[in-house]
Amino acid sequence: MHLHSPPLMADGSFSLSGHLLRSPGGNPSRLHSIEAILGFAKEDSVLGSFQSEVSPRNAKEVDKRSSRHCLHKMTEEIHPQQEHLEDGQTGGYGDPYSAKTSSECLSPGLSTSNSDNKLSDDEQQPKKKHRRNRTTFTTYQLHELERAFEKSHYPDVYSREELAMKVNLPEVRVQVWFQNRRAKWRRQEKLEVTSMKLQDSPMLSFNRSPQPSAMSALSSSLPLDSWLTPPLSNSTALQSLPGFVTTPTSLPGSYTPPPFINPASMGHALQPLGAMGPPPPYQCGANFVDKYPLEEIDPRNNSIASLRMKAKEHIQSFGKPWQTI
């Protein structure tokens, strides 16, 4: 088929005129459409043979026509794609060249690069986290927050909103502050509990000697005054009395208890002491001081010796009413 009329050249179905593509033998060569030149049809081998024969001027005309054809294809593809998306169907539009999009028509390699960039952006978006700036509280704000924390460790939302308006802070910041303050308070409570357990450990309670059952019954049955309670309630002082001597080392070896003092008589002697009141300070006689020198005992250095000395004074106070009778 030979092309001799100019109107056929204006049509976009043919790319080159007959006189440009005639072979040297006079026979007309194959004519190619714009689709074949742009690569829509797989005729690359035939297209390569004619690229060398096309002049630069004709190449510019071909580029202009191809760009017009691409724009025309873009406008035709927009409306069918919208209708196709509304119907929810997939596939082609009945046109063998409809698989080519406008982006592929303009630049075939641009669509793949754009899709790769979109995928990389989607992968990077979850990794980005919004970092909140650290809130710096003023002295007034901390004072008001501490006062509110003393009133209630768990304020409700209305109290938090009122406090937030008072200290000019967002309610979320006030809530976070109370959470951190409660955590700090729990840590302090745990430290206090552990310190109390260390104080009450058995290593520190070995000095506490249990009281004998007989002495506890005696002290509970006797109506003693407050000034007699400390020495009698102490087991060390009670063991130093003559009626409760269990070891020979509790009193000096030269001391012998008087014959009128025994456990039975001591109970009768202690009964009228509740009505007598506190006795006057007892003055030891000269013979007693000479027999038991007190200079050898230092109450400030030895607590046991001081308790023994108090026990001796009570023993002498018990024996004095019997001697007068």
Curated annotation (Swiss-Prot):
Record motif Nuclear localization signal, residues: 308-312
GO cellular component: nucleus
Comp. bias intervals (Basic and acidic residues): 75-87
A Pfam family reported for this protein in Swiss-Prot or TrEMBL: Homeodomain
Alphabetized GO MF terms: DNA-binding transcription factor activity, RNA polymerase II-specific; RNA polymerase II cis-regulatory region sequence-specific DNA binding
Localization annotation: Nucleus
Motif (Octapeptide motif): 32-39
CDD domains for the chain: homeodomain
Transmembrane segments: none
InterPro entries recorded: HD (IPR001356), Homeobox_CS (IPR017970), Homeodomain-like_sf (IPR009057), OAR_dom (IPR003654), RAX/RAX2 (IPR043562)
UniProt feature, compositional bias: Polar residues: 99-117
Location of the region described as Disordered in the Swiss-Prot/TrEMBL record: 75-136
DNA-binding region listed in the record: 130-189
UniProt short sequence motif OAR, positions renumbered to this chain: 302-315
Keywords annotated in UniProt: Developmental protein, DNA-binding, Homeobox, Nucleus, Transcription, Transcription regulation
GO biological process per UniProt: positive regulation of transcription by RNA polymerase II; regulation of transcription by RNA polymerase II
Domain of life from the UniProt record: Eukaryota
PANTHER family the record matches: HOMEOBOX PROTEIN, PUTATIVE-RELATED, RETINAL HOMEOBOX PROTEIN RX
Entry similarity comment: Belongs to the paired homeobox family. Bicoid subfamily.
Cited function: Plays a critical role in eye formation by regulating the initial specification of retinal cells and/or their subsequent proliferation.
Record's protein name: Retinal homeobox protein Rx-B
Organism: Xenopus laevis
Higher taxonomy: Eukaryota, Metazoa, Chordata, Craniata, Vertebrata
